[in-house]
Amino acid sequence: MAVAVTAVLFLAVVIAPQWTETKKPPRPSDTSDTSGTSGRDRRTMCPLSIPGIVQNCYATLNAFPSKECCKDLKTASKREVTCLCNNVIAHPDPLYTNTNQVNKACGVLDKYACDAGNSNGGATKKIVASMGLFGVVASLFF
């Protein structure tokens, strides 16, 4: 009986925060393509609007970016930052694995955080993880 109660409490503790967590609406792709094509086509067109940044900064596989790269990253518009976040940084290609190192070296890590609108800084996931761990530990003792 105690095992069943512990199992139910464990599931309630782990699952409940996921039910009460607010969900963000899906973000539309921010692209330069206004021809009315499908979202998938527009997402693939977005990197074409910023080839210089991708080529000079992320495609080099070098953690030490050039001055030109840093200048481009620092002067990028909000539209370009959103495009890079949605297509290169958030969904990295194996060729672009150095995005965080390049952004950090150029001093623009905060600008390219890609989820700056989330003000809790991942606290929800930490709470869920700690509650799940508590449930596992509690189930060992009861």
Curated annotation (Swiss-Prot):
<keyword id="KW-0472">Membrane</keyword>
<feature type="disulfide bond">
    <location>
        <begin position="83"/>
        <end position="114"/>
    </location>
</feature>
<keyword id="KW-0449">Lipoprotein</keyword>
<comment type="similarity">
    <text>Belongs to the plant LTP family.</text>
</comment>
<protein>
    <recommendedName>
        <fullName>Non-specific lipid transfer protein GPI-anchored 34</fullName>
    </recommendedName>
</protein>
<keyword id="KW-1003">Cell membrane</keyword>
<feature type="region of interest" description="Disordered">
    <location>
        <begin position="21"/>
        <end position="43"/>
    </location>
</feature>
<keyword id="KW-0732">Signal</keyword>
<dbReference type="Pfam" id="PF14368">
    <property type="entry name" value="LTP_2"/>
</dbReference>
<comment type="function">
    <text>Probable lipid transfer protein.</text>
</comment>
<feature type="compositionally biased region" description="Low complexity">
    <location>
        <begin position="29"/>
        <end position="38"/>
    </location>
</feature>
<keyword id="KW-1015">Disulfide bond</keyword>
<feature type="disulfide bond">
    <location>
        <begin position="70"/>
        <end position="106"/>
    </location>
</feature>
<feature type="signal peptide">
    <location>
        <begin position="1"/>
        <end position="22"/>
    </location>
</feature>
<feature type="lipid moiety-binding region" description="GPI-anchor amidated asparagine">
    <location>
        <position position="120"/>
    </location>
</feature>
<feature type="propeptide" description="Removed in mature form">
    <location>
        <begin position="121"/>
        <end position="142"/>
    </location>
</feature>
<dbReference type="GO" id="GO:0005886">
    <property type="term" value="C:plasma membrane"/>
</dbReference>
<dbReference type="InterPro" id="IPR016140">
    <property type="entry name" value="Bifunc_inhib/LTP/seed_store"/>
</dbReference>
<feature type="disulfide bond">
    <location>
        <begin position="57"/>
        <end position="69"/>
    </location>
</feature>
<dbReference type="GO" id="GO:0098552">
    <property type="term" value="C:side of membrane"/>
</dbReference>
<feature type="disulfide bond">
    <location>
        <begin position="46"/>
        <end position="85"/>
    </location>
</feature>
<keyword id="KW-0336">GPI-anchor</keyword>
<dbReference type="InterPro" id="IPR036312">
    <property type="entry name" value="Bifun_inhib/LTP/seed_sf"/>
</dbReference>
<keyword id="KW-0325">Glycoprotein</keyword>
